Regions:
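Ligand-binding pockets and gating/stacking loops
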Residues: 1-487
Length: 487
């Protein structure tokens, strides 16, 4: 019997209202580990205690997902379009636009003047990948990377677009990719979560986007598979230290008493989320020892900071976050989700994009090289990209030195490295305007299917029953594994 049905058999009207009357108390206790998960619906969790649900041996055992929030400008970084120099300030042809949907921010513009990239490009590596001058460190490792220049999505605004690429659906309430991985493969370290979220602080904060905790929700999967968010300043997790005057043994006895009460509650109601809560409190207690060790960089040699850059010493920076990614994966964390904000360049590309690239360029190089030197890259899939791309036409004013770019869902670039992808691969092609895909399109569903394949899952069979349906990350529409990307 599914746990949700078992729960329904035991719950009574009195129990229902008793649960509601204790909501504030539960919310306060939940701060031991992070965002409250009591509202997470119970789901099919019969397999949740199994360590591995994979259908075949996967190449990737860990994922580090570096999400550039806002949508990086592909034609300023990776999608070289030299012919656009001849089109400066000319209107984007209607034959290219084809009446496609625009955001409300530019749909009222009388003109759509083309803004060629002001940055120089050069070819790098044996693969000959064109990389913009703002990413000199990334350019050094293109033969270790797999570039997809033909990603596309239907979502044109940030909230649905980020939700879509993280959960496979534009609607909220679905499990994210990290939760699916935790559910399917389980944890490798009982002292750390299987899924950790890090939010890096950008140097430039001109136009940051909201980053909601629902992006690392477990949705209809058991609550234990939700991401645990580490803070970028102060204690990584609230209440990681005991309150003044409360020794560890008192904290231990308190949790033991709480566990007893929760077990009594479970015997009465058979709510599977009660067991999840017990496990979360126990993990929180163990993290009091494991997390300070994780975040203490004193043991790192000077060569580490030479690799990642001096900013790696400063908590909250992208470079520091990248170093923590390696330390987390090294300790067995399955999925590390990083969010780096302020890539939403509606204006002032010249003033903002260089800062963004400086934040991430050397740090990404350091992360890939560090994993490679330690023999971890083959089993760790690193993903870099945003939720959509940018337009070739300028939003607002245009000059030779500066311009803005609106959202563009019909083509954008991501890259991956390690974890079973083929280094030195350049997949997909866009037209001369970087506006439409002309070869080898990759939809988000294909992207998700490929990631699941690298983890050892057949995306059509990796399902969980919820609300009478077999739910899956890739949904019900067609999706395929992009085999050209696989090593």
């Amino acid at each position: 019997m599914q746990p949700i049905h078992e729960y329904g058999r035991h719950i009574t009207r009195r129990h229902f209202f008793a649960q509601g009357s204790h909501a504030l108390g539960w919310a306060a206790l939940a701060s031991l580990l992070g965002p409250d998960r009591l509202a997470v619906p119970a789901a099919a969790s019969a397999a949740a205690d199994k360590p591995n649900l994979a259908h075949f041996p996967g190449k990737a055992k860990h994922i580090i997902y570096l999400h550039m929030v806002g949508g990086p400008s592909q034609m300023d970084l990776y999608d070289y379009k030299p012919v656009m120099q001849e089109y400066y300030d000319k209107d984007l042809p209607e034959s290219i636009r084809m009446g496609q949907r625009l955001t409300t921010m530019t749909s009222g513009q009388k003109r759509f003047p083309i803004a060629p990239s002001k940055y120089k490009f050069a070819q790098h590596g044996q693969c000959g990948m064109w990389v913009g001058e703002l990413l000199p460190w990334t350019a050094k490792m293109v033969d270790d990377m797999c570039f997809v220049r033909s990603m596309h999505t239907e979502a044109i605004n940030h909230e649905p677009a980020i939700t879509y690429i993280q959960t496979g659906n534009m609607n909220t309430g679905r499990p994210c990719l990290g939760a699916w991985m935790s559910y399917g493969l389980g944890s490798l370290n009982e002292d750390l979560p299987a899924f950790v979220v890090l939010v890096a602080q950008p140097t430039n904060t001109e136009q940051v986007q909201a980053i909601s905790a629902r992006l690392w929700s477990s949705g209809y999967l058991p609550g234990e598979h939700a991401g645990v968010s580490f803070r970028s300043a102060g204690d990584p997790i609230l209440y990681i230290n005991n309150p003044p005057g409360v020794p560890a043994e008192v904290r231990r006895r308190t949790l033991d008493g709480l566990k007893t009460l929760n077990e009594i509650n479970f015997q009465a109601l058979h709510d599977p989320e009660t067991q999840t809560r017990i496990a979360q409190y126990e993990l929180a207690f163990r993290m009091q020892a494991s997390v300070p060790d994780l975040t203490n960089l004193a043991s790192e040699p000077e060569s580490t900071f030479g690799l990642y850059g001096e900013q790696a010493r400063k908590p909250g920076t992208f470079a520091n976050t990248a170093l923590l990614c390696r330390r987390l994966v090294e300790r067995g964390v399955r999925f590390v989700q990083v969010y780096h904000n302020n890539w939403d360049t509606h204006s002032n590309v010249a003033g903002r994009l260089p800062d963004q690239c400086r934040d991430v360029d050397q740090a990404c190089y350091g992360l890939i090289q560090d994993l490679k030197q330690r023999g971890m890259l083959d089993s760790t899939l690193v993903i870099w990209g945003g939720e959509f791309g940018r337009t070739i036409y300028s939003q607002g004013g245009l000059s030779k030195e500066n311009y803005g770019r609106d959202h563009h869902p019909r083509c954008f670039t991501i890259w991956m490295a390690g974890g079973g992808v083929k280094g030195g691969t350049i997949h997909g092609e866009t037209d001369d305007f970087s506006y439409n895909i002309v070869a080898d399109p990759v939809h988000l569903r294909d992207f998700h299917a490929t990631i699941l394949h690298l983890l050892g899952f057949d995306h059509e069979r990796f399902t969980v029953k919820y609300q009478g349906l077999d739910q899956r990350l890739t949904g019900v529409e067609p999706a395929r594994v992009i085999k050209e990307l696989l090593a």
